[in-house]
């Protein structure tokens, strides 16, 4: 029996039989786990209303199999208020985590980066792109794929703002011709290292880099959430 309560968020939920749910979770202390919530879809179930994505939860469970059994659930607060483009962005973040996180690994720091991302999306006024790019870069680091934006791997020397560099997967940035369509300027890399996405040029560079860096880990299966907000060009 797992007696402890854990702060958790639901990344994805799906029906199981007529009355139960399978929940894919990000938890503070135990990383990504899967639970079965028995009876959660029954008409009088108290669980039905708050076993939803973006609702901060306290959960406890039991079992030794890959899919645990939910034993208790309490909402910590109401759901993080996400609508429109910001809701689609949250679904994208959830799908990234479901696809990329290995189960039962401690991702405690990532849990708080995820919470920060949701809060940033909830408070954003115009665009979700800054919050998404910061989270994608943090996710790469937590997965062990962090990138040194400030040095050329060929020489070990600091990148030069006026020069052009190309990213080599799991290696780093190498010198590249100025007209390289896949290149990044040293200035852009310096901005990415700071997480400083204050202008559209840097935001576009950040988006291009995270797409390149995440693609090998996501494989060929497309993200379902991207089809929801393709019209927003995220």
From Swiss-Prot:
The keyword DNA damage applies. Disulfide bonds: none annotated. GO terms for biological process: DNA recombination; double-strand break repair. Pfam families: RecO_C (PF02565), RecO_N (PF11967). Gene3D superfamilies: Nucleic acid-binding proteins, Recombination protein O, C-terminal domain. SUPFAM superfamilies: ArfGap/RecO-like zinc finger, Nucleic acid-binding proteins. The keyword Cytoplasm does not apply. One of its GO terms (cellular component) is bacterial nucleoid. Keywords: DNA damage, DNA recombination, DNA repair. InterPro entries: ARFGAP/RecO (IPR037278), DNA_rep/recomb_RecO_N (IPR022572), NA-bd_OB-fold (IPR012340), RecO (IPR003717), RecO_C (IPR042242). Belongs to the RecO family. Involved in DNA repair and RecF pathway recombination. This is DNA repair protein RecO. The gene is recO.
């Amino acid at each position: 029996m797992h007696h402890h309560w854990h702060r958790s968020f639901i990344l994805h939920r799906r029906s199981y039989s007529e009355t139960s749910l399978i929940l894919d979770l990000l938890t503070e202390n135990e990383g990504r786990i899967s639970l079965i919530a028995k009876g959660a879809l029954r008409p009088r179930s108290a669980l039905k209303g708050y076993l939803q994505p973006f609702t901060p939860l306290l959960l406890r469970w039991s079992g030794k199999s890959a899919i645990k059994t939910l034993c208790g659930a309490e909402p910590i607060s109401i759901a993080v208020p996400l609508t429109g483009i910001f809701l689609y962005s949250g679904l994208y973040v959830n799908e990234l985590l479901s696809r990329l996180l290995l189960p039962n690994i401690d991702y405690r720091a990532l849990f708080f980066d995820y919470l920060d991302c949701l809060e940033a999306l909830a408070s954003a006024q115009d665009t979700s792109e800054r919050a998404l790019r910061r989270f994608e870069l943090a996710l790469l680091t937590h997965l062990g794929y962090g990138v040194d934006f400030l040095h050329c791997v060929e020489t070990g020397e600091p990148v030069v703002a006026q020069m052009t560099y190309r990213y080599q997967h799991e290696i780093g940035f190498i010198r590249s011709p100025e007209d390289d369509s896949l290149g990044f300027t040293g200035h852009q890399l310096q901005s990415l290292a700071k997480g400083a996405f204050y202008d559209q040029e840097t935001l576009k560079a950040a988006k291009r880099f995270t797409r390149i860096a995440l693609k090998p880990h996501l494989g060929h299966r497309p993200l379902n959430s991207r089809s929801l907000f393709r019209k927003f060009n995220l």
